A protein has these predicted regions:
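C-terminal helical cap(s) of enzyme catalytic domains, especially alpha/beta-barrels
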Residues: 77-103
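Solvent-exposed loop/turn segments at secondary-structure junctions
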Residues: 4, 74-75
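A general structural detector for well-ordered alpha-helical segments in enzyme core domains, enriched
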Residues: 15-19, 23, 51-58, 82-90
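Short acidic/histidine-rich active-site segments
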Residues: 68-72
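Acidic/histidine-rich catalytic cores of soluble enzymes
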Residues: 1-49
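A structural motif corresponding to the C-terminal end of an alpha-helix
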Residues: 55-64, 93-100
Length: 103
């Protein structure tokens, strides 16, 4: 969970990518969510401090190709739009990293 790892990095002084590197050969999927210092739940995508592009690039380097996003239902009647917005946010982070280079 790169969001939780980001908060842990503030506590322990080890970057998220260093932490991910320590799992080399043992990671096959990643959990994507937003966090802010000391808060781990119900943070809308794009409003926190999770370093998506940098971390997704590292995960790609480590062979990770499966990702799951964490979506929170907070009682909003427009929850379907919240899910669409979150999915679009994550696609906009994942797609450029995994985009094929064509000549």
């Amino acid at each position: 969970d790169i969001g939780n790892l980001k908060n842990a990095s503030l506590l322990y002084g080890k970057s998220v990518n260093e932490d991910l590197q320590s799992g080399q050969g043992h990671l096959f999927a990643a959990h994507l969510k937003e966090t802010i210092p000391d808060h781990y739940r119900e943070i809308p995508f794009g409003t926190g401090h999770t370093e998506y592009t940098e971390n997704i690039e590292k995960l790609k380097e480590l062979g990770v190709r499966m990702f799951v996003g964490e979506f929170w239902y907070t009682g909003n009647k427009e929850w379907k739009n919240d899910v669409k917005d979150a999915a679009l946010f994550l696609r906009n982070k994942l797609d450029p990293v995994f985009e094929e280079v064509t000549a």
